[in-house]
Design a protein with these regions (language model features):
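Intrinsic-disorder/low-complexity detector
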Residues: 2-185
Length: 185
């Protein structure tokens, strides 16, 4: 539990936009981006509240299961098991979903396309529980999904995935290409 609280607190303290920055969005009449960032922050808070249960290391299958996949973060090769692979997939999907919303918000606000300036891209912790993979790995894959989602949302396209009923989903072949998981068995 301490790790999760530490991760979320670090995200809140270091990466959450100060109130003055949010007010700046309102001043610039960037209402859609302001609303998107407010939703992102509310979702982070809800996530924190949902993950209050203590992690039981004695029965955690992640601890007892051997590595079954390798993956790359930049030029570094890492290894994980099925639980970690699932978290990385989740990171890409959450990133795509949040990217679509941020891209749509910038388009609605008639702002230039700039995924790197989006708060969700900078934070990249949405959905991270502090388990199974390093936070930096989660952030990397979240941003890979975010970038593609932002492109689809800003351009009103479905090049990398789809967005239906308020939820985005990246295409399976795109997900596979991003992750580049290699089975070790």
């Amino acid at each position: 539990m301490k790790l999760l609280e530490s991760v979320l607190l670090q995200s809140y303290v270091q990466n959450i936009m100060p109130l003055s920055s949010l007010k700046m969005l309102q001043t610039q009449q960037r209402n859609a981006q302001y609303a998107a960032q407010q939703r992102y922050l509310a979702n982070l808070q809800a996530q924190r509240q949902q993950m209050q249960a203590q992690r039981n290391y004695n029965n955690d299958p992640y601890i007892t299961n051997p590595y079954s996949y390798s993956y790359r973060v930049g030029n570094t090769v890492r290894q994980t098991n099925q639980y970690g692979a699932d978290v990385l997939k989740q990171a890409v999907n959450y990133g795509y979903d949040q990217g679509v919303q941020a891209g749509r918000a910038d388009r609605q606000d008639r702002r230039p396309s700039s995924y790197r300036n989006a708060f969700g891209y900078q934070d990249a912790n949405y959905g991270y529980s502090g388990q199974y993979v390093a936070q930096s790995d989660y952030n990397y894959y979240f941003r890979e999904g975010f970038r593609r989602g932002y492109t689809d949302g800003y351009g009103s396209t479905s090049q990398y995935g789809s967005f239906n009923n308020g939820s985005g989903s990246i295409l399976g072949n795109v997900l596979t290409a991003i992750l580049g998981l290699t089975n070790l068995r």
